[in-house]
C-alpha cells in the first residue's frame, strides 16, 4: 500500500486536477479553498471539504485506489469491522444505505438521526458514502419496494410524475428527498463530504444494443419510464438537495449503463461508476474503456461488486478505478457477535480477495487518508 507520513497525509502535495477541456491545474489539498470555479468549473456548488475529496480522487487517477465497503443492509460499520478483524486494516470508505428511510424513528430499530456511526467513522478520517434503495408503496399497500411491476408486492409508481409539479407523485418524491436531506444536514454542518450515489442501476436491462427483447426493462422504479424521466428526476433531486437544502458537501456518483441517453450531464455528475458481478477481466476492461471514451475528465469507480478480478489483476491490466466497494454479505456480517463473523468466507469479496488488495501499492485504507476537513 501507499505509505504516507503524517506530514504527507496533511499536505498531499502536487495535486493535479484534470479539466474537461484537457488542461490541468496543480495545487495541494490545503490550497483547494483558494482554487476558483473558473479554474475548475465543476467545483461550483461544492464545499471546501467536497473539493478536497474530489481533488484527491482526481489527482489519484492511475496512482491509487480507495478501498471501501457497503454497510450490511443499512446503517452500520459491520462490513468494515469484519475486514479489520481479519486484516488489521479498515477500508477507506463506508457506504450506508437509506433503504429503511420510511421506518426510521428516533431511538427505533433504525434511526438515521443517530449521528454516532458517521461521527465515529469520519473522526478517524474515514470517508462516508451513501446510497438509497428508494422504496415506494407496493400495489397492495402493505409495504414499500423499489421493484417495478403490477404484482401485489411490486410498485406501479411512475417517475414520470416528476414532469408535473402539481401531481401527488411529484409531491411524494420531493417529500422523500427532503427527508434524506434532513438526515444529511448534520454531516454538512460538521464539514463531512459524502460520496452520494442515488438512483443507482437505473438503466437496468434497457440497452441500445438489444432493444425490444423480453428482458429490456428497468430493475428499479426510477428507471421504468426510460431515460427522459430518469434524467429529469436526477436533476430535480440535485437542485433540491444542493440549491434548496444547501448540501454542497455531496459528491455525485452516476451509476452508468451502456447508453448515453441516461447520463444527466457533466454539471450534475462528479463520478461515473459501474457495478460488477461475476465479471471477467475482459468484461471490466470493456467498461473501463467505455468510460474513458464517453466520460473524459470524470472519476471512474466500482460502486458495487461481487466475484470480479482481483485488484492486482485490474491494476496490471491498466484499469485504474478510483475506488472499489464490494457488496455486503448478510449471512457473514449481519451479526458481529455470531460465529459466522469469524469466518473468512464472503459471497462477494472474501479475505483472500482483501489480502491481495492490501498487498497492492495502489490501495488506500482508512489510516492512510489525508484530512479532508
Residue ranges of model-derived segments:
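Aromatic-lined carbohydrate-recognition surfaces of secreted/lumenal glycan-active proteins
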Residues: 68-70, 197-200, 234-260, 297-308
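Loop/turn elements at helix/coil->beta-strand transitions in domains of secreted/extracellular proteins
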Residues: 62-65, 89-92, 123-128, 189-195, ...
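N-terminal module-boundary/linker segments of secreted carbohydrate-active enzymes
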Residues: 18-22, 38-111, 118, 313, ...
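Substrate-binding cleft of secreted/luminal carbohydrate-active enzymes
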Residues: 61, 65-72, 298-373
Amino acid at each position: 500500500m501507499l505509505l504516507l507520513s503524517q506530514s504527507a497525509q496533511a499536505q498531499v502535495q502536487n495535486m493535479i486536477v484534470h479539466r474537461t477541456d484537457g488542461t490541468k491545474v496543480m495545487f495541494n489539498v490545503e490550497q483547494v479553498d483558494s482554487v476558483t470555479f473558473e479554474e475548475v468549473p465543476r467545483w461550483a456548488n461544492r464545499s471546501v471539504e467536497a473539493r478536497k475529496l474530489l481533488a484527491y480522487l482526481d489527482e489519484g487517477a492511475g496512482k491509487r485506489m480507495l478501498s471501501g465497503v457497503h454497510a450490511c443492509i443499512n446503517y452500520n460499520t459491520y462490513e468494515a469491522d469484519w475486514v479489520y478483524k481479519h486484516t488489521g486494516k479498515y477500508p477507506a470508505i463506508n457506504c450506508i444505505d437509506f433503504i429503511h428511510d420510511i421506518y426510521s424513528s428516533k431511538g427505533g430499530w433504525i434511526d438515521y438521526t443517530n449521528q454516532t456511526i458517521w461521527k465515529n467513522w469520519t473522526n478517524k478520517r474515514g470517508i462516508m458514502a451513501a446510497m438509497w434503495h428508494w422504496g415506494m408503496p407496493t400495489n397492495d399497500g402493505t409495504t414499500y419496494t423499489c421493484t417495478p411491476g403490477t404484482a401485489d408486492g411490486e410498485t406501479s409508481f411512475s417517475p414520470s410524475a416528476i414532469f408535473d409539479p402539481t401531481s401527488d407523485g411529484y409531491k411524494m418524491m420531493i417529500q422523500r428527498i427532503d427527508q434524506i436531506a434532513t438526515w444529511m444536514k448534520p454531516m454538512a454542518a460538521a464539514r463531512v463530504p459524502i460520496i452520494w450515489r442515488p438512483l443507482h442501476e437505473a438503466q437496468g436491462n434497457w440497452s441500445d444494443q438489444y432493444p425490444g427483447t423480453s428482458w429490456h426493462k428497468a430493475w428499479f422504479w426510477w428507471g421504468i419510464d426510460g431515460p427522459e424521466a430518469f434524467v429529469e428526476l436526477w436533476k430535480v433531486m440535485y437542485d433540491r438537495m444542493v440549491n434548496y437544502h444547501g448540501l454542497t458537501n455531496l459528491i455525485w456518483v452516476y451509476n452508468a449503463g451502456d447508453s448515453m441517453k441516461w447520463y444527466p450531464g457533466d454539471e450534475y455528475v462528479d463520478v461515473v461508476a459501474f457495478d460488477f458481478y461475476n465479471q471477467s477481466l475482459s468484461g471490466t476492461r470493456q467498461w473501463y474503456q467505455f468510460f474513458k471514451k464517453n466520460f473524459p475528465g470524470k472519476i471512474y469507480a466500482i460502486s458495487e461488486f461481487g466475484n470480479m478480478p482481483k485488484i492486482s489483476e485490474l491494476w496490471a491490466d491498466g484499469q485504474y478505478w478510483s475506488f472499489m466497494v464490494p457488496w455486503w454479505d448478510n449471512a457473514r456480517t449481519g451479526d458481529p457477535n455470531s460465529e459466522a463473523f469469524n469466518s473468512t468466507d464472503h459471497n462477494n469479496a472474501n479475505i483472500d480477495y482483501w489480502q491481495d488488495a492490501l498487498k497492492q501499492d495502489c490501495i488506500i485504507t482508512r489510516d492512510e487518508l489525508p484530512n479532508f476537513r
